[in-house]
């Protein structure tokens, strides 16, 4: 199985986590999984989003790699240069492929490059994905949004996410020397994550922000009473999740939010808006605290039983993620 992606380590985000964990499960099951990633090419940082590196000199090298690997199935995970060239090679050589939709880049463009018409991005995304045999999307809510921008509903498959990886399986609590309750945010510190909505909430206790990004310096200066810890990973991150009272997820642009399932695996209740991603995760559950008012959502979450979070988290596994992925690939032999 070949996965072509513009997002992979050392990037830290939900796309990378999904592709890596899916591959790990498939490898354990005896499948051979290969990746075409940016580390195989010359790259430069994406303007206004430096963590993402744009690959150059990808054609005809992507085609040569596909030819050399001779995969039984090809999955194109991103719409960047690597994904675009892998798609082009497949179409040119009449090879079947699947794609997945991880990021609403049309919405990101509106935030970062408002001069570019959103319709252009929507048209590009629809054209990119509609040539695939199947399109894996994060949630049912996202499927409905993507129908509106022209993506073929008949090809879309809901592809859920896990959260039960590494240190998140059994996190160790630590003593955080801050006034309770402790409200934690984990993720990229950038405009599309809507962190300001969390920082402006009038909440008793302590707000902790974990992550890095272009808005970090500005927000630290603007909110000096809040605690900014920078980036943390693996056991240290899981311990901060487990030792906080509520995880606040203010994003309105994420297509799922793996940090949500990671928090639940640590027994930490979640406050969020009722938008695609959180809405799909919590629908019908007794730990659903979503509200259009983030402060109200946070106060509801504070009353949630942590054991209920741990129990609910069991339904989100990478084994299920890998199963859906494998069941929907399109073999070329």
What is the role of each PLM region?
Residues 302-331:
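A charged, aromatic-enriched C-terminal amphipathic alpha-helix characteristic of glycosyltransferases
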Residues 147, 163-179:
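Acidic anion/phosphate-binding donor-loop and adjacent secondary structure
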Residues 217-236:
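Nucleotide-activated donor-binding/catalytic signature segment of Leloir-type glycosyltransferases, i.e.
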């Amino acid at each position: 199985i070949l996965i072509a992606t513009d997002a992979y380590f050392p990037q830290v985000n939900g796309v990378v986590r999904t592709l890596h964990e899916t591959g790990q499960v498939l490898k354990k099951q005896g499948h051979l999984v290969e990746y075409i990633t940016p580390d195989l090419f010359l790259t430069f940082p994406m303007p206004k989003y430096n963590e993402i590196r744009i690959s150059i000199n990808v054609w005809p090298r992507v085609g040569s790699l596909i030819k050399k690997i001779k995969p039984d199935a090809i999955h194109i995970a991103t719409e960047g240069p690597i994904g675009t060239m892998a798609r082009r090679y497949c179409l040119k050589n009449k090879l079947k492929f699947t794609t997945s939709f991880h990021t609403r880049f049309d919405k990101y463009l509106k935030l970062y490059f408002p001069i570019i018409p959103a319709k252009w991005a929507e048209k590009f995304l629809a054209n990119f994905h509609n040539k695939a045999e199947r399109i894996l999307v994060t949630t049912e809510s996202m499927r409905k949004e993507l129908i509106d921008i022209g993506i073929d509903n008949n090809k879309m498959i809901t592809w859920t996410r896990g959260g039960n990886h590494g240190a998140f399986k059994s996190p160790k609590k630590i003593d955080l020397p801050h006034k309770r309750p402790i409200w934690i945010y984990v993720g990229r510190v950038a405009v599309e994550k809507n962190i300001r909505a969390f920082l402006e909430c009038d909440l008793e206790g302590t707000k902790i922000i974990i992550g890095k990004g272009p808005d970090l310096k500005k927000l630290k200066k603007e909110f000096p009473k809040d605690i900014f810890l920078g980036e943390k990973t693996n056991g240290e991150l899981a311990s901060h999740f487990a030792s906080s009272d509520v995880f606040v997820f203010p994003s309105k642009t994420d297509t799922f939010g793996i940090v949500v399932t990671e928090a639940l695996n640590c027994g930490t209740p979640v406050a969020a808006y009722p938008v695609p991603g959180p809405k799909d995760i919590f629908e019908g559950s007794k730990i659903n605290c979503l509200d259009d008012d983030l402060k109200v959502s946070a106060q509801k979450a504070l009353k949630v039983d942590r054991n209920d979070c741990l129990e609910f988290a069991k339904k989100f596994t990478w084994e299920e993620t890998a199963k859906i992925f494998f069941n929907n690939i399109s073999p070329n032999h």
